Amino acid sequence: MSKHFVITFQRQRGLSLVELMIGLTLGLILLLGIIQVFISSKQTFATNDAMAKLQENGRFALEFITQSARQAGYTSPGSTLSRPFPVERTVCGVGNTGNNPCAVNGSGSAADVVGFTFEPPVIDGAKRDCAGAVVPDNNLVVNAFYIIPADANNPTAALGCKSFNRTTNAALSAGQRLIDGIDSLQVLYGIDTGGNSQSVNQYVSADRVSNWGRVVSVRIAVLANSVDVLNPAPVQRNYYLLDAAPFSSNDGRARQVFTTTVQFKNL
């Protein structure tokens, strides 16, 4: 008995226009989701990088200043130099003229200036100031810290330092940018009102210090920014540094206040 096989052919059907449009729509939605995740990841990375830079700027700025503050008033063992006041309050030449004192209280939210006097210790075979210039033996140095404003070549303000030889009254280092992204520097001076305990009774600004011999500590605050502009920009707010008027900016950069206190040991 023979068997017969019947082969039937099905007509091939393609996608309808509606199905094609639905597929394209789903594909676009998926693509938009991937793009959104990519953009969000990029923004998160940029924000985290900016915040890390901000933290680094603030910590390094305080470290530069406190290195000099901890040495303030120091003279090496056996030195013939008279022990200086830790805080220098006479002419520093910070700014555009040579008539600016080292201890300046900025008006309102304007930055302060602070200078510390000491005999530099020998490091790597030489005595150096805050900018790395060599200081001769048996000479006192003054490291003065201040804020260098932004300009056409530098979009953000910076912590600056310049120094001079306190023994000869000669300039050592011209103004140097130390740390970019520092908007403000504020300083308060701890006063021992009794004059015999080296214990702080009050903190005051430079213009309220009547007896620099009773200054036994210094409180320092800096306002650091992220240098890079963030997108989306942080919400504009006020930043409070010690007794200064609030600082505010809407330039799209993140900011944070860093504060420390240094007790003078060389009194």
What is each stretch, according to the model?
Residues V37, S41, A157-L159, Y189:
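A short secondary-structure junction motif
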Residues V6, D49, K53, N57-F60, ...:
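Short linear sequence signals and composition-biased patches located at protein termini or domain-edge surfaces
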